[in-house]
Amino acid sequence: MVVGGTGGKAGDPKGYFYPLGFTFVSKMFARVTFLPSLAYNCAMERVSARQWWDRIEPRVILGAIPFRSDWMALNLGMNMTTEQMVEMEGVRGVVSMNEDYELQLMGMQQEAWKKLGVKFLQLENTDIFSAPTQAKLRTGVDFMKEVVESGSSVYVHCKAGRTRSATLVAAYLMAEQGLGPEEAVARMREARPHILLHSPQWAALKEFHKGVNQQNRERIS
């Protein structure tokens, strides 16, 4: 399932605003830097304490992109195949914040996940300069909640598992545990210290938090 396009585009009242034309530039920058930055992430996994994925909650996993190729998975950071990860971690749902080209290059797409018995949701978002729209955050949180309540684990990823996917997991923590944006990010960093959010992601989380608070007030009244 693919929902919408890229969040944070100019004129989107639910995204972080940038001048017209910036979206195109940011998309091109993300494409050009995709492979170099992925190589950096693979190297950091080998020379530092970083893990390819970390459990943020008992049934919520935040991580980097699962590779389609067994060779890449075994040699570039995952240290096991994606199929092995699914079985070992009990993953039955995956949310990808990647754009199509990222998954087409080396990631797992819907049919590949289906063969492993895993539900898949793609919420496309450009890396670094944009944040998921509020609609995408709500859709992602609902999907995560459904998987968790079924007793299985959900794996949320982007390229490195530190910005786009971290934004969604933070929204989930706010919705399910009543945390504020700063508290949610601090909770994630306890398990995954290299999480990195920029102004657009913080703005999206603050907007989402307002929505959660409004819903809570409406339930009480």
Give the residues covered by each predicted segment.
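Hydrolases whose catalytic domains are alpha/beta-hydrolase-1, hotdog thioesterase
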Residues: 164, 168-172
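Non-catalytic regulatory/accessory regions that flank a structured catalytic core
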Residues: 1-58, 210-221
